[in-house]
């Protein structure tokens, strides 16, 4: 059995092509736990999680990445936030009924794929592409073609392992500033495309690579763990409250007695009473714990 929730990087010795392989189970489960999404939405979030992990691994700097789908369909928003440490969180917003067999275009409607990269040092970058492909992988390949102009292929699979949702994916990319023959890249892509969900989700990474590329020389590097981690905090909520007009905050306090701020990503609640608000306005940080 593979060690789920790990990202593996690998290189082809005889081609200027790099690869990545990721499988997620526990991280995906934690993203889904706090919500009751229809199955097609769960699948989209699983694919987005895999894609974000793979994209994050292509970054050469410390920082955050957000991959989101947005449109006028019943799935108005689906987003995964991640960072170079492979710490992930995600959420979706559903408006209206979703049929069990809904595909990506039915879910999102007329929409966009938005990728936002925020380095710890340097300028923020955002790329936007229309949802012209039939799958998330196809849309992401279009993004790479338009933005980085590096030949890139993604292969994403979803399923269940031991009754729990799981997902996996592989990425192939021509290495920057190196010449790779188009036929070599296409050959490797054809091999990778044969991967089945069951193989990717149940076999160790070395076995997957052996099955796909046993005639090639491949170097597999040490894996990086993938985990769910939410960045919400009481301090961040306090900062958000501080930006609201005093009249609006006071009105909520008068009506409700306290302000309940809920994190859509992890389900945490942060409660603020009148004394907390007074401390916030005096630039102090209220120390009450959050409510789970």
UniProtKB/Swiss-Prot annotation:
Disulfide-bonded cysteines: 230-232, 263-266
Mod. after translation: Under oxidizing conditions two disulfide bonds are formed involving the reactive cysteines. Under reducing conditions zinc is bound to the reactive cysteines and the protein is inactive.
MF-aspect GO terms: protein folding chaperone; unfolded protein binding
Subcellular location per the Swiss-Prot or TrEMBL entry: Cytoplasm
One Gene Ontology CC term in the entry: cytoplasm
Family assignment from sequence similarity: Belongs to the HSP33 family.
Function: Redox regulated molecular chaperone. Protects both thermally unfolding and oxidatively damaged proteins from irreversible aggregation. Plays an important role in the bacterial defense system toward oxidative stress.
Name this polypeptide is given: 33 kDa chaperonin
Species assigned in the record: Salmonella paratyphi A (strain AKU_12601)
């Amino acid at each position: 059995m593979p060690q789920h929730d790990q990202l593996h990087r690998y290189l082809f010795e005889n081609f200027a092509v790099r690869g990545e392989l990721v499988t997620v189970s526990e991280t995906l489960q934690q993203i889904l736990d706090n919500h009751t999404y229809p199955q097609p939405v769960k699948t989209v979030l699983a694919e987005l999680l895999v894609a974000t992990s793979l994209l994050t691994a292509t970054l050469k700097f410390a920082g955050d990445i957000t991959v989101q789908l947005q449109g006028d369909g019943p799935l108005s928003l689906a987003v995964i936030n991640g960072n170079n440490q492979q710490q992930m969180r995600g959420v979706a917003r559903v408006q209206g009924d979703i049929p069990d067999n809904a595909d990506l275009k039915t879910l999102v409607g007329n929409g966009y794929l938005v990728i936002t990269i925020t380095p710890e040092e340097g300028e923020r970058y955002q790329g936007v592409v229309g949802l012209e492909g039939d799958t998330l992988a196809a849309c992401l390949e279009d993004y790479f073609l338009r933005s980085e102009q590096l030949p890139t292929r993604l292969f994403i699979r979803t399923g269940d392992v031991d009754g729990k949702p799981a997902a996996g994916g592989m990425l192939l990319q021509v290495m920057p500033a190196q010449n790779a023959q188009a036929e070599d890249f296409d050959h490797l892509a054809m091999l990778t495309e044969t991967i089945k969900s069951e193989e990717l989700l149940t076999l160790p990474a070395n076995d997957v690579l052996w099955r796909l590329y046993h005639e090639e020389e491949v170097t597999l590097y040490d894996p990086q763990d993938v985990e769910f981690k939410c960045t919400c905090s009481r301090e961040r909520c306090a900062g958000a409250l501080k930006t609201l007009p005093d009249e609006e905050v006071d009105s909520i306090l008068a009506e409700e007695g306290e302000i309940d701020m809920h994190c859509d990503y992890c389900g945490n609640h942060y409660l603020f009473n009148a004394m907390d608000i007074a401390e916030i306005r005096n630039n102090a940080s209220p120390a009450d714990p959050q409510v789970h």
